Amino acid sequence: MIIKILGEGCSKCDEQLKNVKIAIEELGIEADIQKVEDFREIVVYGVMSTPALVVDEVVKSSGRVLSVKEVKKYL
């Protein structure tokens, strides 16, 4: 599983990354977590507001920080 956090280095993006790491640990799954900060790459996903969560190249959420519980639903 490849998980990407899209965002240009904002504090909300860092919080989303933290919640994703916690969710993965609690679920006991393996995943490659990538932080994408390049605006040109973010636009390719059609995301206009960050942070965004992408799981296996599918945008699951954008524009708000998901809780650990919400992240688990998408994994």
Give the ranges of each region predicted by the language model:
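Structural micro-motif
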Residues: 46-54
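Conserved hydrophobic residues forming the short capping helix/wall of the S-adenosyl-L-methionine
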Residues: 20, 24
